[in-house]
């Protein structure tokens, strides 16, 4: 009887743990990024001659849609990048540019990511766009139902990837206004494959006042 009780207790604990892992209770809470915090982020160009710039240069006059890529080789990130790129014609009409930032430049990862992303890509070595409160998802991600649903969705859509580079620090998407408009949209990835709403991105981009 004692062994049965122990066995049932272990099963019950496992089930309770699985249920808990699929709630948001164990997830690190994000801290909103202020426009001043993001504006002072140090970025580097990747194409051609490397140069450094402050992030505010990306949106000061035209606003911007910026994807903070969790990992360029991740097939879920490639899926979201492709979907954001589908908005490029509409963003161009609005005069709002599309950019991405990555944490690191590993091998050919950025080059291989380019077919999925229609905007310019910058290096954010200090990972400012992943803060100010960095959020990580490790093994917990692989027992979350939502993550597996995201895996299946992207796989069925034909996306492929690899395991190169750091992929546990979660990313997000920002829509930045011009001048003093501030952050118009901040989407923080809560789990692997948690995509931003394209409708929300476009709605926020339409609020940008582009300087002529």
From Swiss-Prot:
Q: What is the lineage of its organism?
A: Eukaryota, Metazoa, Chordata, Craniata, Vertebrata
Keyword Cytoplasm attached: yes
Question: Where are the active-site residues found?
Answer: 77 (redox-active)
SUPFAM superfamilies named among the record's database cross-references = Thioredoxin-like (SSF52833)
CDD domains, sorted: PRX_like2 (cd02970)
What keyword terms does UniProt attach to this protein? Antioxidant, Cytoplasm, Redox-active center, Selenocysteine
Give the molecular function GO annotations.
Answer: antioxidant activity
Q: What is this protein called?
A: Peroxiredoxin-like 2A
The gene coding this protein: prxl2a
Q: Which organism is it from?
A: Danio rerio
- Give tissue specificity per the record: Expressed in kidney marrow.
